[in-house]
Amino acid sequence: MPSTPADINAIFAAGYNARDVEALAALYEHDAVVTNPDGSMAVGIDAIRMHLGQLVELGGFMTSHNRYAIPNGDLALVAADWEIEFTDGRERITGRSAEVVRQQLDGSWRYVLDHPGGG
């Protein structure tokens, strides 16, 4: 689990590259919200887990580079440039994300709001 807000997006990319939906879902609070590419929202961990399952089916290799991580108490605003590259000729996918993360009682950080295209 991320020990600082700046760690979370790199840990997400590692989970994506391992195709580990459960490791990815563990990065979210139970009632978190993720914005989907079509503008709809995945609300709550069950919907987020389904979203993540569809995401990892894309395959490829994800990298994520933080643009900033701004902490304020137990909350932080994080943004990153990310990309998924493919070896099968598909065009790479890129984006700029914006997330709100919250520090948990154990000191780790989890997503509260995740907007993969909101940066």
Residue ranges of each PLM-predicted region?
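Short glycine-dipeptide loop
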Residues: 30
